[in-house]
Amino acid sequence: MLAHLNQVTRIPPCPPFSGREARLKFHFFSWSTFMLSWPNNATLREIRTRAATNLTHHPHLVDTLYHASPQTPFLTRSGALYRFVTCCNCTLPNISIQQCKAGDRPGDLEIILQSNGGGRPASFQFPSSPTGSLLRCIVAASLLPEVSVGHQELSPLRSRSQGGQTDVRSGPDPARRLVALLRREDGAPKDPPLGPFGHPRGPGPAKSEDEESERRDAPPPPLDSSFQASRLVPVGPGFRLLVFNTNRVINTKLVCSEPLVKMRVCNVPRLINNFVARKYVVKETAFTVSLFFTDGVGANLAINVNISGTYLSFLLAMTSLRCFLPVEAIYPAAVSNWNSTLDLHGLENQSLVRENRSGVFWTTNFPSVVSCRDGLNVSWFKAATATISRVHGQTLEQHLIREITPIVTHREAKISRIKNRLFTLLELRNRSQIQVLHKRFLEGLLDCASLLRLDPSCINRIASEGLFDFSKRSIAHSKNRHECALLGHRHSANVTKLVVNERKTRLDILGRNANFLTRCKHQVNLRQSPIFLTLLRHIRRRLGLGRASVKREITLLLAHLRKKTAPIHCRDAQV
């Protein structure tokens, strides 16, 4: 009865196939399953869509890419490879694609980007694993037809003629001669196509069958393509940031009932056309609506809605208006302004975003530095926090990449990849910006782990399991009066305070994103504990490697702190 347990059952890595078509379907299913496991990202969606479209229309290329040996490089001239590789490094887990010059160190699983200007090509080496091999094939499929395996081009038309269709050539065969005669009609003059009213239609750009079929098979854009509450933007090698939409300003018009207009809506005299007649603040859903006069007072009302959230929240807000306004109909709405905010997590010397910069100006009524490029203003605050208005979507992402890349790649910039990965992960999990209390606690954990020579990557693993998750609606983190009113609290600005030297100090007095060095630089007049100086010396050793200016700044700060604390220590010793 136990004899069958002595036999070892071996399961083959691939199931037995009955034909070539079944094998191609299995490979395409494996690639599709791998692509569907990717996170939600605009660039990853582009890679997934282009690869699936090319492989669906040309299934004979699946075998060519799948059976290519790891030592055979893929060659391409498409500039989209840089963008695809950067997105994969920043978004896909356990993926690190190395970039080097082609020919220096030939390796396995590489894609060589050839320069169109005759320069030296660049090589991108994928990880030596099944996942890296699969990712290389998918990236190559998304770059078709500008890809070749070794010296063999993968043009779809050429591969199609080699895969199953016979190449039509003129010869002694009567069938070939007939096909050649019929093909001559393609070059003959023809009448222009007629338009919808019988008039000749003007000449347009020629469209291939592949483009038309791709347009027909393209999936419809998602409903949230024009609005994203948070957007992940990869900037530079391995640096990520999350941009959050704080609020939007939406303009529209209302049609009100005639008998109740004078009584409930516009019971004030009209001064000018854009005069605010009435202003309402609603707590749930939280929004502010302002009523304006129009020419047809009593029939139409122009409203201005300031709201944060999705379009579903906006529809709920418009429904809430019917509770206190005699609304009969609402005209189509238009978004007039977008406001977004972001934090540069992992930038140790945060003063770099405001110092020694050209093309910026200071505002007098608000302590911020405004950088103006392409007609768009980005306001930078003290703790590497920025706000940007008027743009959203892909335009916002491209403008932020142009704005932040010079800061991240500056020769004096000191970037902590561990902090950037940790704080970005928490913001991505909780869909809100990390709060002051959480950031200080986690930054202290990371610095103490580095001081005690422990592995700080374990904190990232714990955070990925949800141990450090937070809620933006908790009382100690919220400054929104609507949320505090919903929770039954009296004060709207109930931010956590600390008692230092018999004085209350707010945690966010230097900004939500203020790190250890920023607090040391602006709060040196307070009495500090001995562990404070120990951590500061350790940070000087850690950040001073190759950064003379940062080390010099911390050394001056240490000398200033010793001078401040010296009389206190002497007095304590006498007592």
Curated annotation (Swiss-Prot):
Chain spans, region Disordered: 153-174, 186-228
Alphabetic keyword roster: DNA-binding, Viral transcription
GO molecular function: DNA binding
Function noted in UniProt: DNA-binding protein that is required for viral late gene expression. Selectively recognizes late promoters by binding to a non-canonical TATA box element (TATT). Part of the viral pre-initiation complex (vPIC) that is responsible for the expression of vPIC-dependent late genes. vPIC is composed of at least BcRF1 that binds the viral TATT box, BDLF3.5, BDLF4, BFRF2, BGLF3, BGLF4 and BVLF1.
Biased composition annotated in UniProt, kind: Polar residues: 158-168
Source species of the chain: Epstein-Barr virus (strain B95-8) (HHV-4)
Superkingdom as given in the UniProt entry: Viruses
Any one Gene Ontology BP term: viral transcription
Family note: Belongs to the herpesviridae UL87 family.
TM helices/strands, residue ranges: none
Protein name in UniProt: Late gene expression regulator BcRF1
Family matches, as InterPro entries: Herpes_UL87_C (IPR004285)
Keyword DNA-binding: yes
